[in-house]
Amino acid sequence: MKVRASLKKRTPECKIVRRNGRLYVINKKNPKYKQRQG
């Protein structure tokens, strides 16, 4: 998982989700795009 200052959807399958007050990008098809806002 990458920690980034600003999240971007890198593919159309990416979803932005808020968990515990943090923003995450999840991608079921290609998990290498997982990100968290730091």
From Swiss-Prot:
GO cellular component: ribonucleoprotein complex; ribosome
Entry keywords, A to Z: Ribonucleoprotein, Ribosomal protein
Protein name: Large ribosomal subunit protein bL36
Lineage of producing organism: Bacteria, Pseudomonadati, Bacteroidota, Bacteroidia, Bacteroidales
NCBIfam families: PRK00831.1 (NF002021), rpmJ_bact (TIGR01022)
GO molecular function, one term: structural constituent of ribosome
Example of a GO biological process term: translation
UniProt similarity note: Belongs to the bacterial ribosomal protein bL36 family.
